[in-house]
């Protein structure tokens, strides 16, 4: 007697359901894909008991004839493809012909459908995959599918479902992603007979406000790039909107909701140091590519895809995201306590909860614009305060305006500080100086923050993280270019390492040389410092090197960093000016100029904000002027 037997369809369907129907959200996803493929422009989702008791999807799509309705619940029956070659030109979301058979086999399943030409609709009712009732029914054009008592006949699967809150969240995320991917469709959702949302207008930004709170869309960066191979459109979130949940990253490839590790990693790397450790940015991106260049038949759940040339896609995708980020001003605005917070978006303990962004839809200013805003803030209107130049020792090297590709005019003016601004008499009309002869006004607050008057209000800079950003980019560039910029010490300094310090020293020795450290072995875990980078303060050579090694080890144990990136971060953190250090006026100006010459002036290498702005409009509102 043969030991191998063909499984009955009902058993095969239950096994298949283990892959296709993992939880109530899986049912919702499969049914929504069918509704969209049917051409619906109105879809309603209703659930009870987080989908365990009921899932109902109502659409106004094409509907089905009787023979199609009976076939659609059969395994491997589909209208989407007829041959294997159709997979190379697939335009529909569904194609496997497994979903309804799998769902009906583990639930009490009801299907009601009517086509536009039919006067009477059809009702089919299944229990455990077996048809138990067929009847006519009145109803609107389209299809309604009700799934009751999911996994009622598979107790082991039902037992492993999570709490109602967890299952509800999974369902809501699925529906939300489809509502964002298909703005041309009117969506309505109910949970336990309570309406959760109803979105009609085909506006993605408006829908983002519905799901994430008012003014959320104002913090989006819009991008649109395309070539003959790939089209990329959508929205990027500003760094202060970063989250720990990757659920708030939406990738739609040919309008299909997908998860793709390469795309997620490329976005994360493009944001780079703008992100705090273990945070992810909000993104909503539509990628359009020739269907023959992707494989959607990776898993029965159809959430994963493969690109035929993933490297080529990444080489196009990453620069687009990086360029969009670099072209926008990421300095947050201070907001009064009266202003609304995006509490639904931001983590409760986030350091960025005090920050929000200006309501400037469809437009953001560039780094160069902010620098010019800072330069033009030197001039008060209608009157200009008397200012005088101050010349003191420089901690930061000054650069000519030609050194700043994004920095605007690179003017050099003077300022005596806060007391001179308050006490100086106003200029007469005939002695008002040329605005280009006046330096922007800068004050140091508590030897920690730099306050600058800008044309549109006020800018506050954290002096430590600003200098850290400057030093970090210099260090990265010097190491990558392999042109050490070292200043020799008149009296070499001896350093005796502990065993663990010497081990790390050996690991980074070559890159220390690239950075500008001229170090000579002296035997028995001892070295002589004969030269250091020009940014190292005299007298601090030994301390800086030891602190760098300690910082490097700490970063290596907590973060997954490239060796040079780790070294640059360690160097900049330990060598930057500290909070509490008094700066001269020239040092403050030079620091700001150098900051705006960097590629990413809005965050330090560890992701903390460098610049905060307070606009005149916000000040006027705080003082009741508006």
Curated annotation (Swiss-Prot):
One of its GO terms (cellular component) is mismatch repair complex. Pfam families: DNA_mis_repair (PF01119), HATPase_c_3 (PF13589), MutL_C (PF08676). CDD domains: HATPase_MutL-MLH-PMS-like, MutL_Trans. GO terms for molecular function: ATP binding; ATP hydrolysis activity; ATP-dependent DNA damage sensor activity; mismatched DNA binding. InterPro entries: DNA_mismatch_repair_CS, DNA_mismatch_repair_MutL, DNA_mismatch_S5_2-like, HATPase_C_sf, MutL/Mlh/PMS, MutL/Mlh/Pms-like, MutL_C, MutL_C_dimsub. Keywords: DNA damage, DNA repair. One of its GO terms (biological process) is mismatch repair. SMART domains: DNA_mis_repair (SM01340), MutL_C (SM00853). Belongs to the DNA mismatch repair MutL/HexB family. NCBIfam families: mutl (TIGR00585). This protein is involved in the repair of mismatches in DNA. It is required for dam-dependent methyl-directed DNA mismatch repair. May act as a 'molecular matchmaker', a protein that promotes the formation of a stable complex between two or more DNA-binding proteins in an ATP-dependent manner without itself being part of a final effector complex. This is DNA mismatch repair protein MutL. It comes from Pelodictyon phaeoclathratiforme (strain DSM 5477 / BU-1).
